[in-house]
Every structure is written in structure tokens, then in C-alpha cells.
Amino acid sequence: MEIAALGGQYQGATLLFYESPLDRGCDVAGPLRGPFYCPAAATVYLDRAYLQRLAGATTDSTRAALGYVVAHELAHHIQGLVGTTLLVDQARSRSTRALATRTLTTYELQADCYAGLWLRWAGQRGNLVAPPDPAGLLDAIAAISPRSDASRTVPGPWLDPLTHGTRAQRLKWLQVGLDSGDFNACDTFSAEAAGKL
């Protein structure tokens, strides 16, 4: 996995483990729960309780699901390094609410694809017990993230189809990353423009 393929140079993000709820993070008033990335601080916030619940889920996909959660948030860091975050923020500030939401969803699906790239890389190096199963990953996350949970995350709940895409879209883009091993295959923005998101 080489970020140079996207024209960027990798600079590490800070990983910050926190106890939920978080009163304030990334200039957003809390309470905040769950994993999220803060571009202003180049920091991935990881909720210990969330990760412990996920680790406690007894499925074959648990270890990969933990990696997927962290990889998805680090994918937002990569999006920032290569300029995608800035372009998305600019587009969202100049568009209608509906278009801004669609742009955010496209951005989140690209992060899922990048997470798929990482899962492929980790699997090839023997860092996963079993080959990643995208449906199993999302099932493990759904099992610990009830829809009724009113907790806030940035920019929205992990399972919210309005911010992160539908289950089918997430499965598709995770699989694209797993199958391709290529950052360029994760061009969700061109796919959205062609009506193929």
C-alpha cells in the first residue's frame, strides 16, 4: 500500500484512545462516542468502550473488524494528506444540503474502500486469522452499535446510511478495496458522478 500512488507522502496520524463519552473533541461539543477522525488535529479518536464491545463479539470477523474500524478512520487521514478532504469540504460548503450529504457519503465510502486495501495488505502478511469477510465485518459492528443509541460521532453514526452509505454500498466498496489492492480503484467520486456508487 503506497500513498505515493495518490500523489501524497505519508505523515502519521495521532491515535488517541479515550473513555466515552467524550465531552469535547475536534471542536465539537459532546458527548461523543465511537471512533472518529479529526482532520484539524490529524488525530484518530478511538473509544475504548466501543473497541472493547467489538473485541467481545465472538465472531470470526472480530479481529478484522477491529482493524477495519481503525483503518477506516486512518483512511480519512490519507484523504486529508492527498487533498480529498479539502475538496470535499469546499464542495459541501457550496452545495445544497442533499448534495452535501451525497458528497459526504461518497467520501465515507472511499474510506471504506481504503480500509479494504488495508485489510488486503494485512491478510497477505498473515496479520488476520481468516480472510476478511466484508459482510461479517459490518455484522460485527452492527451487533455492538444499536440504531437506538443516541450517541454522537463525527460526522455521523457509523451505521447511518445518510452519512456512511447503505449496507450494500459499504459492502461493495470494501470489496473493491479487498479485490483490487489499488488506491486508484477507490475513486468513489467518479463512480458517484456516473451513477454507479
Summary of predicted features, one role per range:
Residues 46, 64, 68-81, 111-112, ...:
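Active-site recognition of the HExxH zinc-binding catalytic motif
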